[in-house]
Amino acid sequence: MLRERFLTGGAEAMPDYELLELILFRALPRQDVKPLARRLLDVFGSFGHVLAAPPARLTEVTGVGEAVVQELKIVEAAAQRLARSRVLQRPVLSSWQALLDYCHTAMAHRPTEQFRVLFLDRKNLLIADEEQARGTVDHVPVYPREVVKRALELDASALILVHNHPSGDPTPSQADIAMTDQIRHAAEALGLVLHDHLVIGKGRELSFRAEGLL
């Protein structure tokens, strides 16, 4: 049985459709959920994209009802909570891989652009992670003044900007570069440090700092 294989061999030995079956079993007990698991993967392309899909999109798939959506969203929330716990209130700069893992878990599979700001204290501990804006498939509106204002409200000393590219390609646009420069200037004027701007793609990310863009 799938459950026994999962308990003895772990998820690494299971293909995506079988792991998805285990989740679907909870919503649809005593049903053959393999066809639905494969259908979801065909529609959304990957396990991560299935979990991140909006409820309205999920229910367009034949066989998906409220119970299935609920189970998928519980798993998505649990994965994000676990990844977040590995970076919250920890020195971010020395836990960089954990931070990247969290950003990929939270943002890599989203169908539209999302812009987040990670606020750090004087010891570079992550004190807040907030979504600042949501956009379309290729644009998200960001207001530098609001970002800096929020940093002051939180008594933050440094920032890390993060946004995703639903296309999967993390190459920054000219608008991304210009916006980052505006936030950097606004932050520096108030004594705040902009450590980096991460663009999250599918399976990889781009660091403005590493690319010499900061």
Curated annotation (Swiss-Prot):
Keyword Protease: yes
A Gene Ontology molecular function term of the record: metallopeptidase activity
CDD domains membership: MPN_DUF2466
Keywords for this protein: Hydrolase, Metal-binding, Metalloprotease, Protease, Zinc
InterPro entries, A to Z: MPN, RadC_JAB, RuvA_2-like, UPF0758, UPF0758_CS, UPF0758_N
Family membership: Belongs to the UPF0758 family.
Record's protein name: UPF0758 protein
Source organism (scientific name): Rhodobacter capsulatus
Organism taxonomic ancestry: Bacteria, Pseudomonadati, Pseudomonadota, Alphaproteobacteria, Rhodobacterales
